[in-house]
Amino acid sequence: MSKNILYITFVDFNEQKSGSSVRPKKIYDAFLEEGYKITLLTGLQNRKLERWKNSLEFYKSIKKGNFDFCYVEPPAGPIFNLCDHLLLLYISKIKKIPIGIFYRDAYWKFADWYQLKGIKRFIINTMHKFDWMIIKKTCKKVYFPTKTMGDLFDFKEKEALPPGCELLSVDDNINKNVEIVYVGGVSEEYGGKLLLETLDKVNKDKKMILHLVCRKEEVGKLGEYKNKPWLNIYHASGNELKEVYSKANLAIIPRKIDFYMDFSMPVKLFEYISYELPIIATRCKEVAKFIEDNNIGLVTDDNIESLYEALMKVNVDNILEYNKNVKIAKKNNTWNERVKQISRLSNI
């Protein structure tokens, strides 16, 4: 294998603001670490002229070269520009290069979660269906965040390709008490209300600090809890999170259990593992399975009583036991391991 590959992304690597934009760069860096020579297409699709120019240059590179496979990290929504569909057809049908694509989201399939209505929804759904038709015609394998999500789609060759961990250097936590970190939205579906109500109840029986990282505009949703002595609020991202994580010895994912949450796999799960934090999570199917399979924490129902019971049971000693398994899970689920999985495309 020459280790020459094509990599198509829809982000600007200099503007990484969300999980969907961070992931393509992590994959890219892991490919480089594994010794791959990458012909790369980047650029935001809403910058149409720039995208078409980049696609033309990418096409010229493909014409001249030989490549083992092509990997695609698509946008969160549908593909806007026809040049990208044409590239996939050219790579697959003319150059005969095997293509694998990561299909990140299925919001558009589910009315309860999909916020668009009326003609906008019809147009976006039509675009998603057109994308899927092109994918079925051009791709040898489709990767999904989880197996459960993959089961919703009809495709012969499919695999789960969840986010990865970073091999960060982490100091051993010396907390004498349980201190929890939560990074994310505080809306009800993401478990904000459940988390705050439960921690308030716990703190009537024993001290337990919550380090909560959220956006500034969400502070109003914290209501009566924002001034509680057990709650520390931060607005941090990127490297700023390291200091917050260092304060905690336990992480939490308190999502409301529903059909969509059952098949999603949050990036934060693997970020928590990267910082070697055991995890308490509600019983959303794929998250719960990962935690239980790796024995890296506790799983509860999405109600106050169940979460309260788990938090009352947890202590520094069993956190240290879970921490040993977290370190193993971290090594087994790096971005480099994800890239090794993708590299099997060359054998198809």
How should each PLM-predicted stretch be described?
Residues 69-70, 90-112:
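Active-site proximal beta-strand in glycosyltransferases
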Residues 190, 241-244, 251-271, 281-289:
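Nucleotide-sugar-dependent
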Residues 124, 129-171, 182:
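Donor nucleotide-sugar binding/catalytic pocket of nucleotide-sugar-dependent glycosyltransferases
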Residues 19, 302-304, 315-347:
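A charged, aromatic-enriched C-terminal amphipathic alpha-helix characteristic of glycosyltransferases
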Residues 86-94, 109, 118-142:
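Membrane-proximal helix-turn-helix segments that form the acceptor-binding/catalytic region
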Residues 23-27, 166-168, 176-223, 234-241:
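Conserved catalytic-core segment of nucleotide-activated headgroup transferases in glycan assembly
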Residues 60-85, 96-100, 141:
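Short N-terminal targeting/anchoring amphipathic segment
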